[in-house]
């Protein structure tokens, strides 16, 4: 077997992963970057991000760093890290201009000036878009073109990372699996940019690859995790059956004036929050959930008819087309919507340059907890966090570059041996197992939680785990995904049980009030067991 050394190994090919790979390939001496993706290059949560990217831009005279900090802290409900928020806000102008230098094209007006839009809980227009409502796809398409043509970036598609190689709390590489064969990639810089956890829930706006792999890998490696109870449910996913189920109806539609209404066409958000339809997402999701219960239906409606045909076609071409494909005319018809798991505020505890509690292990993007998002992410802050942390990571690694070759000693070689043992003849229906897990999480650890529901979810997950006998080694990529989903689900439920209050996206109907003092839930794996730490 060949044991190859790399300047950096990046696991995940969304915006944070690809941007980190590109910046590292540009900044490191004799760069040799390995970019690993579980599906095809560019298939990620980032690709489906419609709303846009936040930036406090020098071109936008009505905005300021102070204003963006204030909005982010208000949405974060006491759990944001002020220094992280300030750094990312201050850095946004530089990094977004670098994206533009790399060839990303943001929407502009007829005078060639950047267009800024408004979204929920933002006090000013500061969100930028690519092609109206295809921002994630626009950014990722350009980054994919760069990374796939770079001589310094090797891309491995349809390959999953199954274990991080750690010794004495230092990460030295990872074990990869392409569905048939295993291989080891060695590096002093291993970057997890593996995305979110949406597939843990029955309803989600996330693609099928969002199975919490990065968080499960980091947990198994002993890295500290933080605030895993905070799952953001987007209020407006398209409530239709079939291939378009849970397609995201961007918050930007409400930012331009659309209203949530009941089946009689009556707006209802005024009775839930002073900001009405532009209230923080947790508030709007719970409001939708309550209205659905009142009406005895699985959806409410979004009324975008007052926006008019011209604005709809200009700003929301993707959403408009998706609605038309489902027999809905946005300019004339109400859109059936319901909440769906959308974004994970929790994750691996990391600095703004991706460093974690394990030397050599870096985490960026949605699987990281940097302190920007707090208990409830501000709309469109996620793509900003992806690019700023990737950019800062590349700067840090350049400054501390270690070119020493990692030798494949007996410790490393022995790590691989277990993966070639016979597994026996057990075959698992992973689709059925995933569906069972998704229902458990939706019912017990979803939008509105309580002790009884969480305890029931905890017990049901233990029972589900007893049906799945794989421990370290699995037969295929789908089994590895399910193993990761099970691990992260149990961690989320444990963290949700520990937080006996309601804060941000975590709502406990048995503890509806927010404590005066905000505290993080931090956890790690010690002696093979979950341990909460301060």
Per-range role (PLM):
Residues 17:
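N-terminal Rossmann-fold NAD(P) dinucleotide-binding loop
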Residues 80-93, 127-145, 156, 204-212, ...:
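Short beta-strand to alpha-helix junction loop
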Residues 9-11, 185-194:
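Short hydrophobic core segments
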Residues 1-7, 20, 27, 32, ...:
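Glycine- and aromatic-enriched mobile tails/lids
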Residues 39-73, 77, 232, 243, ...:
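Conserved N-terminal glycine-rich FAD pyrophosphate-binding loop of Rossmann-like flavoproteins
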Residues 101-181, 193, 237-240, 260:
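Conserved redox-cofactor binding core of oxidoreductases
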Residues 163-177, 184, 328-370:
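FAD-site-proximal beta/loop scaffold in flavoenzymes
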Residues 217, 223-329, 387, 396-402:
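An anion/pyrophosphate-binding glycine-rich loop and adjacent beta-alpha core
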């Amino acid at each position: 077997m060949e044991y190859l050394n790399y300047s950096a190994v990046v696991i995940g090919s969304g915006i944070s992963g690809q941007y980190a790979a590109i910046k590292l390939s540009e900044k490191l001496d004799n760069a040799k970057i390995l970019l690993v993706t579980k599906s095809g290059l560019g298939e990620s949560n980032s690709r489906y991000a419609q709303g846009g990217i936040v930036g406090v831009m020098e071109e936008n005279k009505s905005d300021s760093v102070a204003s963006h900090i204030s909005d982010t802290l208000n949405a974060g409900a006491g759990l944001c890290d002020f220094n992280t928020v300030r750094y990312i806000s201050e850095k946004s102008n530089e990094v977004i201009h670098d994206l533009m230098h790399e060839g990303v094209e943001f929407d502009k007006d007829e005078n060639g000036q950047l267009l800024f839009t408004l979204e929920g809980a933002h006090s000013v227009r500061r969100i930028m878009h690519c092609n109206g409502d295809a921002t994630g796809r626009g950014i990722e398409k350009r980054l994919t073109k760069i990374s796939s043509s770079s001589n310094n970036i090797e891309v491995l598609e349809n390959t999953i990372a199954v274990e991080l190689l750690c010794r004495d709390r230092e990460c030295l590489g990872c074990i990869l699996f392409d569905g048939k064969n295993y291989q080891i990639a060695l590096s002093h810089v291993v970057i997890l940019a593996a995305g979110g956890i949406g597939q843990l829930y029955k309803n989600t706006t996330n693609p099928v690859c969002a199975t919490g792999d990065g968080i499960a890998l980091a947990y198994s490696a002993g890295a500290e995790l933080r605030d895993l109870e905070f799952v953001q449910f987007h209020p407006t996913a398209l409530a239709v059956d079939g291939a378009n189920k849970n397609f995201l109806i961007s918050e930007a539609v409400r930012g331009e004036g659309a209203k949530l209404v009941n089946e009689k066409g009556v707006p209802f958000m005024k009775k839930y929050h002073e900001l009405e339809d532009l209230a923080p997402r947790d508030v709007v999701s719970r409001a939708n959930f309550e209205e659905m219960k009142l009406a005895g239906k699985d959806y409410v409606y979004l009324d975008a008819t007052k926006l008019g045909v011209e604005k709809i076609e200009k700003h929301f071409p993707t959403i408009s087309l998706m609605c038309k494909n489902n027999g809905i005319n946005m300019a004339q018809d109400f859109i059936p919507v319901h909440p769906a798991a959308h974004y994970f505020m929790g994750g691996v505890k990391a600095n703004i340059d991706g460093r974690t509690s394990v030397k050599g292990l870096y985490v960026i993007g949605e699987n990281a907890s940097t302190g920007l998002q707090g208990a409830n992410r501000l709309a469109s802050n996620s793509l900003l966090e992806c690019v700023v942390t990737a950019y800062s990571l590349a700067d840090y690694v350049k400054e501390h570059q270690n070119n020493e070759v990692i030798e494949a000693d007996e410790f490393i070689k022995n790590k691989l041996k277990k993966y070639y043992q016979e597994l026996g003849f057990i075959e698992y229906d992973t689709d059925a197992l995933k569906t069972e897990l998704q229902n458990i999480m939706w019912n017990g650890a979803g939008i509105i939680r309580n002790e009884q529901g969480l305890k029931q979810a905890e017990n049901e997950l233990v029972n589900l785990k007893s049906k799945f006998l794989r421990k370290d080694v699995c037969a295929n990529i789908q089994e590895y995904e399910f193993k990761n989903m099970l691990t992260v689900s149990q961690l989320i439920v444990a963290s949700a049980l520990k937080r006996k209050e309601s804060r941000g996206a975590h709502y406990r109907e048995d503890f509806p009030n927010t404590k005066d003092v905000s505290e993080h839930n931090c956890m790690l794996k010690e002696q093979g067991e979950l341990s909460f730490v301060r």
